[in-house]
């Protein structure tokens, strides 16, 4: 029973690493947190994350921590309460591997210029990284962290597979 949770800002290999893990481990990928979901209200948000916490042998591309970051950044988004967050963390602590993927702001901005994004712009990256640092340092679960400016997606995927096997 494993829940692999990939967190981090845009352009930090979350989807790429998720695809590589899925191929190797045969785990499905679930999109955990999204801008659309964040507009649905607190109860629906909690219900969604609570249901995801019951899953086993899946890869979640963004989960509760991304919600906390983006709901603080974009004020009209729903956010989990501290109590709801701790409830979910308690539920998954025995099976979750929380992976925080990040990079230097200049690396992310360069990748963002190449890829583009309908929600996030280069000017948002510094504040998003700061919020991630705050949120991830307050996470109630052990977190594994990789700088995607220094590690390739292949290296990160191999390391995560080593952690879960």
Curated annotation (Swiss-Prot):
One of its GO terms (cellular component) is cytosol. It comes from the Bacteria. It comes from Bacillus subtilis (strain 168). One of its GO terms (molecular function) is dTMP kinase activity. One of its GO terms (biological process) is dUDP biosynthetic process. This is SPbeta prophage-derived uncharacterized protein YorR.
């Amino acid at each position: 029973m494993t829940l692999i949770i990939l967190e981090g800002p845009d352009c930090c290999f979350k989807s790429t690493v998720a695809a590589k893990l899925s191929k190797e481990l045969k785990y499905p990928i679930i999109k955990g947190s999204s801008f659309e979901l964040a507009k649905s209200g607190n109860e629906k948000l909690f219900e969604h994350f609570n249901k995801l916490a019951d899953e086993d042998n899946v890869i979640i591309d963004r989960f509760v921590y991304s919600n906390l970051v983006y709901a603080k950044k974009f004020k009209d988004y729903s956010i989990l309460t501290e109590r709801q967050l701790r409830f979910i963390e308690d539920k998954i602590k025995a099976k979750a591997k929380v992976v925080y993927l990040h990079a230097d702001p200049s690396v992310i901005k360069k990748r963002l210029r190449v890829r583009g994004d309908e929600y996030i712009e280069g000017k948002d990256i510094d504040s998003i990284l700061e919020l991630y640092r705050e949120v991830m340092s307050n996470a109630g679960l052990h977190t594994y962290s990789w700088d995607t400016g220094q590690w390739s997606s292949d290296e990160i995927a191999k390391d995560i597979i080593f952690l879960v096997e």
